[in-house]
Amino acid sequence: MPHYDTRNYYLEQLSPNCLDELRGKMIRSLIRSKTFNEARIAGGYWRIILDGTGLFHFKERHCENCLKAVHINEDKSKRIDYYHKVLEAKLILNDKIIVSLGTEFIENENEDVTKQDCEQNAAKRLLARIKKQYPRLKICILGDALYAAESIMQICRNNEWKYILNKNDGNQKNISKDYEYIKAAEEKYYEVNYKLEKGKSCFVNHVEEVTGKKEIF
């Protein structure tokens, strides 16, 4: 193996699109090999996790693409933090192997934008690119309550994907009401001790179809 400085120098010469293309070839090779087919859930769907993470934080603006957060101190003065985030789509291959399927940076177009970029908008861009790169891949999107928005769920339905999303009682009142409605009718399902994992979970299906209400974000 070459020295890590040599590897870093080589990678710096490559465009992000080139690296993304290489990742795609590696993922398609893994899927074609059928080595990890047992990782698929019912119906042959591959689980893909959506999750955003922070990369860098600054006290001053780093570049025109910085996101910013305004904090109010105890003395009522304002403090502005600047930061960079990225959204990752991770493909689950088994209980111990998760690989990157796609990457989307969450960033402002310039410092004068009136509305900042966010994880949901980044998710829309990332999901569109995943569909283009893997048009026939059967996918089940996994995510926290942030992605349980009608716009994200509609993308999944249009792509004939499945999705498993958490709910948030505070911000998603309609979904929470539908969820409790199904539970009250005893149409809930339980999963106990899945493979090597020990525990118990409760879930219901088709929450968005029960009362006809939709969460709009």
Give the role of each language-model region.
Residues 162-217:
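An anionic, glycine-rich sequence signature occurring as long contiguous blocks
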Residues 113-174:
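Domain-level cores of phosphate- or acyl-group-handling catalytic modules
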Residues 62-65, 154-158, 178-179:
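Short, glycine/charged-enriched secondary-structure capping and boundary segments
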Residues 91-93, 105-107, 145, 165-169, ...:
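Short, structured patches in soluble enzyme cores that scaffold and shape functional sites
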Residues 1-3, 7, 44-55, 89, ...:
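Short, conserved catalytic/metal-binding motifs centered on acidic residues
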Residues 72-137:
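Electropositive, glycine- and tryptophan-enriched low-complexity nucleic-acid-binding patches
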